[in-house]
């Protein structure tokens, strides 16, 4: 996948490469939806007269991530990266108080079809192994950040600050690579 290879090539930190590969491989999984495929065929057939855009193609990747990895900080980070690759989302709706995950879980995205098509293309074992490697790297980074914050006490930022910087870097590389 071009997005994956480009993102890995511009990554300045080798310990992020597995996380980058996981986010890139899953960010457009929703394009396997029947509705998305039909929309793309209409664009080819009708050109400028076709309906363009507006079809959710990021929810499936984030939802799959959370299903396979469970609810934890890693799955929260990676699903938010995937959900946000075309613009940041509020994590809590001010309208109804629902979390981003609850909102995304309510979306009708042909999830089971997308999941079966993805596993048919890549293999379920490959996806699970990819996520396991990314989780190992996340855990290693998190331990390093915790140690750094503990060793340096005040004045150098909190764990949330440093993990937020990793998030920003990961999101930037995904966005820069997805063109």
Which residue stretches match the model-derived regions?
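Accessory nucleic-acid engagement/destabilization modules that flank
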Residues: 1-179
């Amino acid at each position: 996948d071009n997005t994956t290879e480009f993102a890995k090539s511009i990554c300045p930190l080798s310990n992020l490469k597995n996380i980058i590969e996981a986010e890139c491989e899953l960010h457009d999984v929703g394009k396997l939806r029947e509705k998305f495929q039909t929309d793309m065929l209409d664009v080819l057939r009708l050109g400028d007269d076709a309906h363009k855009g507006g079809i959710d193609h990021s929810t499936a990747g984030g939802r799959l991530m959370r299903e396979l990895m469970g609810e934890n900080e890693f799955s929260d980070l990676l699903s938010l990266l995937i959900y946000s690759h075309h613009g940041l989302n509020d994590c809590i709706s001010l309208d109804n108080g629902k979390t981003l995950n609850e909102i995304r879980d309510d979306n009708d995205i042909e999830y089971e079809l997308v999941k079966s098509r993805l596993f048919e293309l890549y293999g379920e074992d490959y996806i699970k192994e990819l996520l396991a490697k990314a989780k190992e790297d996340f855990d290693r980074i998190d331990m390093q950040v915790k140690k750094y914050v503990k060793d340096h006490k005040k004045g150098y930022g909190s764990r949330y600050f440093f993990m937020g910087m990793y998030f920003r870097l990961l999101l930037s590389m995904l966005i820069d690579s997805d063109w």
